[in-house]
Curated annotation (Swiss-Prot):
PROSITE patterns: ZINC_FINGER_C2H2_1, ZINC_FINGER_C2H2_2. A zinc finger (C2H2-type) spans 194-217, 223-245, 251-273, 279-301, 308-330, 337-359, 405-428. This is Serendipity locus protein delta. GO terms for molecular function: DNA binding; DNA-binding transcription activator activity, RNA polymerase II-specific; DNA-binding transcription factor activity, RNA polymerase II-specific; RNA polymerase II transcription regulatory region sequence-specific DNA binding; zinc ion binding.
Amino acid sequence: MDTCFFCGAVDLSDTGSSSSMRYETLSAKVPSSQKTVSLVLTHLANCIQTQLDLKPGARLCPRCFQELSDYDTIMVNLMTTQKRLTTQLKGALKSEFEVPESGEDILVEEVEIPQSDVETDADAEADALFVELVKDQEESDTEIKREFVDEEEEEDDDDDDEFICEDVDVGDSEALYGKSSDGEDRPTKKRVKQECTTCGKVYNSWYQLQKHISEEHSKQPNHICPICGVIRRDEEYLELHMNLHEGKTEKQCRYCPKSFSRPVNTLRHMRMHWDKKKYQCEKCGLRFSQDNLLYNHRLRHEAEENPIICSICNVSFKSRKTFNHHTLIHKENRPRHYCSVCPKSFTERYTLKMHMKTHEGDVVYGVREEAPADEQQVVEELHVDVDESEAAVTVIMSDNDENSGFCLICNTNFENKKELEHHLQFDHDVVLK
């Protein structure tokens, strides 16, 4: 029994049946690309990585032939559209067919494609399209990428020369400028030239103009030292550099005796003296002189919107970092930092640092990671890990005028205790009772 090669369900030997029409796979052609059915089937076999061996006399029923014809039409339209879009994209990146922004002064010149170049043999166009259709997809993609990279590597010797359209094949020309696959006329494309308002140079596209502006006219002004001629990237770094001409280093503050481990930390500290307050909160509008102060301030807004609450003691925190520090108090195997003068120990180094201020003038002290066994016994008896942070900061709020406005956490001076208390509460998440 002679059945359809593709579906195997239709009997093609019955000449009296309504489905007696038969299509030879080696000779019948699909209407869109005018390629044989065998070539379409070979392409489908390549998609599933299968070798197709068509026997002479293999035929298709009308239904299967129509399905393959529909598939062929879709593929031809797809390749036509893909060619048009990829060519237009490459043109947009290489000054072809750029559309200017509104309000810009441009020079417009219309591109006209001779009709004689468009009206060519339809079979030649179909051949070119179907060659793309039967190519392996990965090979096709690689070819497109290679073509694009090669064009990107070509240097434009004279940007002011008139743009010359590259040679394209007939299929591309019709897809871009002539008639579409359905016979409708497409609007004529226009190329544009744009002029730099700063130097007057003319470019073929808005893309090239923006590249020119970013490279030639958007450079940050150099800040040059009037003494030695060294260049710094901004005014602040130049101010820090002036330390070298005053007998200091870039790790020392110009306005106070403080010194830091890195120049960037020195610069952050000096912003406190400048008090420019160039960092602004986007939610409430408050301005700060240092970026870390703005960061701590943002944590306050985050705590108001979504506070982090300890499930053990029900205390709320502004950030995950401070919450993680707090959870150490509830752990039995938490890390300890022991005072070298008294038996107290702390989970945080900065609380130990503040605690050590209570021993100033008594002895020369240090920091120990471990305590002797006899001192650990005293620690357990004193229960020093209860509310240790509050006990540690009491030295800051004492009546000592020397330390009354000095933050031991970030080494910042304040005019009075009230400002210091506000700073500790909102910038370092210290609970003051």
